[in-house]
Amino acid sequence: MPETLARARAILKSTFGYDDFRPGQGEVIEAALRGDDLLAVMPTGSGKSMCYQLPALVDGALTVVVSPLIALMRDQVHQMRAVGVAAATLNSTSTEDEVTDAWTLLRAGELRLLFVSPERLLTNGLAGHLKQAGARRLAIDEAHCVSQWGHDFRPEYRDIARARAALGDVQTLAFTATADRATRDDVVERLFPRRPQVFVHSFDRPNITLRFAPKDQPRRQLSQFIERYRRESGIVYCSSRKRTEALAETLTRHGLRALPYHAGLDQGTRARNQDRFLQEDGIVVVATVAFGMGINKPDVRFVCHADMPTNVESYYQEIGRAGRDGLPADTLTLFGFDDMALRRRQIDEKDIPDERRRVERQKLEAMIGLCEAPTCRRQALLAYFGEESGPCGHCDLCAGAVPVVDATVDAQKVLSAVARTGERFGAGYIADLVAGRENPAIQRNGHTALKTFGAGRDKPHGAWRALIRQLFAAGAVSETDGEYPGLRLTEKGEAILFGRESIALRPEAPRKASRDQRRREAGSAVEGLDPSDEALFQHLRALRASIAREEGVAAFIVFPDRTLIDMARLKPIDLGAMRAVSGVGERKLAAYGARFAQAVGDFLAR
């Protein structure tokens, strides 16, 4: 093992309390210690930040970290200072005291990590000052933001190359969790003065269970799902502020501790709700998709989407906020015909270049394809990022597999109804017509006399709604323009209607609970802990929450769940035994070790 990597491993243990690197970290850290420029594509929760933190501690030189996420920068500064590392942040919300503190450390040559927003890096000659202070390394987080092909393009990231030039010939490290090949190539071209090493690790997050469900009383579906995780933290994403507040109220009425979070709330309310989410267990935040960007909370146990995401990258990034501690986490995504139609209209109405519109449409179609995947969800998700895998065995489809069947005849009934009604009516109307529902509109329009009226009485109404949604996803029908869009046949739809093509679809069926879900419902909420150890784990969580409130920090900055679980297993009652717990470094041992050892001893003495 190279000497510098051995030193990094020693610091990993003494400072952070971990015995070894996470999978994939070692090779990236080794390249960084050699001085190589690099781009690392690593899944959320794999420990990307450690790949620039450790090199800064090994060589003692200043590392400048660029991030668009102010909350994440603040959290990382708190985390670094909690383990004795000199770190600071400069961004648009920095207080006068924070700015003074950063410059004091910088001038004294003591600063190891400076977190800055991309726009701040070019303000008031900051890059030049950092060059004079001996900045040796530039680390760029969320590097996909520089690419026009990425799902989260930010124009200010285009200026990072200019800032890097002002810093001098510094080593450049770029990190992202979501970048397909086109995005990676764009990042390399725009951020690096020379060809970097590129590390692309698996996108798989095997600790996260993937579930999708067609919308059917979505508030009830979400409440029932979240009820299983009453003592755990989670995030529910909604597409609008109004839906966010309404759903938070619904969950609260069901006895859950739900808080809304969106840009329309005043800053004080947002800050209070975010602090409760970070400091307490069992809080559910119902939010617009902006929430969670930069929320460095490793013990989020579930993420729900009340509405279908716009693209696979956003979906992957948002579910990636669950289970960052490597422990089991769950997800649920609800989707429906209205979601698909709305997302398509939003793209069509955007004032963007045609090439960008084409890319966004392709990304949306991939998201719709994931919702309607006929086989393993994880396999389909990884395939989108160019990664081959076998069936995972525990997503919703693997756990309750429903075979794909030839649906051509049923599709023809729907398509015929669309054609015979003049392509003027929406999905609900067509489903009523085929199912034989004599609603007033159908009677008024004389459509009870059509051959297709009641042609599908042998199936429930919901089955026809589901079939129409899948036909829409498959591109057999689209929507007409106008205030009240109706369904119309596409070329593919006409080919199916007239028998030139067939179509296979997956019938709707209730999903069976996965093995992991049944285990959770039957016993311990933490995989691998027996009930008595879980009681100790919850006791330690309560102590952690108390300390977090005392210090005004996020609970995981005291200790993450993974460390508390190890404590519950090992049951250390003195500082010597506490040293063996994963995640307890020397600084935290001194700060918290005695209180937690006392708590373990008191619990065991009961």
Q: Where do the PLM segments sit?
A:
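Flexible coil/turn residues that form the inter-helical turn or adjacent wing/linker of helix-turn-helix
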Residues: 168, 230, 374, 423, ...
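Short, charged low-complexity linear segments at domain edges
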Residues: 355-385
